[in-house]
């Protein structure tokens, strides 16, 4: 494993476009350098004009230090549409063994990953798909953290990028989603901000979950609905 190098902490306090320029200078891997050199779209870009990419990972668990990515789904989109022909889906071989519980959840088996590439083998395509776009996820602690750890373990440097989190948006829109004990006794029910439940509030169709590409498409549709209804 390459020796990890960590940028100076003050870089992380810079605005994102300046962070990207600084991180491009520090990047030792050509694929990561190219990602940063593409740049970050300005913060004042109207949502109607923003290039976006929905991203979802299926993993062997929830702890990025103990578990690994097994599949990645990406789909570029804008507020005007989702070009499904440009979607990408990879099954990748984790360095850690699959657990029976994770196989039950995402359905990816040992035979599926036996000849699958390591994530480093698809890294150039993955970063090219993300470059110049704002990633959109449903629960940022999975995608950003797992990708950062995966890169640290392979090329010695992690990755940073701004993103939009549809789960965080739902949390903001439903501040009273966890009723008190008294409210529960009075019949008030909690509000789920899970992906499928959030989609139901916007009358979006039900999709089978735990497929990275399907969940990425579902996340793109959810953000479109959130923006149209609330912003």
Where do the language-model regions lie?
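Ser/Thr-centric signal marking residues that sit
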Residues: 57-60, 166, 219
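Short alpha-helix plus adjacent loop in nuclease-associated cores
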Residues: 164-187
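Short, conserved phosphate/pyrophosphate- and ester-handling motifs at nucleotide-, phospho-/glycolipid
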Residues: 215
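Acidic two-metal-ion nuclease catalytic site recognized across multiple nuclease folds
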Residues: 1-43, 172, 200-201, 220-231
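Conserved non-catalytic scaffold segment of RNase H-like nuclease domains
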Residues: 19-154, 158-160, 186-206, 210
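Short Asp/Glu-rich motifs
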Residues: 122, 218-219
């Amino acid at each position: 494993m390459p020796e990890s190098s960590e940028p100076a902490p003050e870089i992380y306090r810079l605005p994102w476009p300046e962070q990207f320029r600084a991180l491009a200078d520090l990047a030792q891997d050509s694929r990561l350098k190219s990602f940063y050199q593409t740049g970050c779209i300005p913060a004042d870009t109207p949502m109607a004009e923003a290039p976006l990419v929905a991203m979802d990972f299926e993993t062997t668990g929830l702890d990025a230090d103990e578990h690994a990515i097994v599949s990645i789904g990406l789909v570029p989109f804008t507020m005007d549409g989702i070009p499904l022909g440009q979607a990408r889906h990879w099954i990748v071989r984790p360095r850690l063994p699959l657990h029976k519980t994770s196989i039950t959840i995402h359905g990816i088996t040992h035979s599926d990953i036996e000849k699958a590439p390591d994530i480093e083998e698809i890294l150039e395509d993955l970063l090219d798909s993300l470059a110049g776009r704002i990633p959109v996820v449903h629960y940022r602690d999975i995608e950003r953290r797992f990708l950062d750890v995966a890169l640290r373990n392979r090329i010695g440097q992690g990755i940073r990028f701004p993103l939009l989190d549809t789960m965080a948006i739902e949390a903001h829109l439903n501040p009273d989603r966890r009723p008190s004990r008294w409210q529960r006794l009075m019949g008030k029910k909690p509000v789920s901000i899970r992906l499928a439940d959030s989609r139901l509030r916007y009358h979006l169709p039900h999709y089978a979950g735990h497929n990275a590409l399907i969940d990425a498409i579902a996340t793109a549709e959810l953000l479109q609905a959130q923006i149209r209804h609330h912003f």
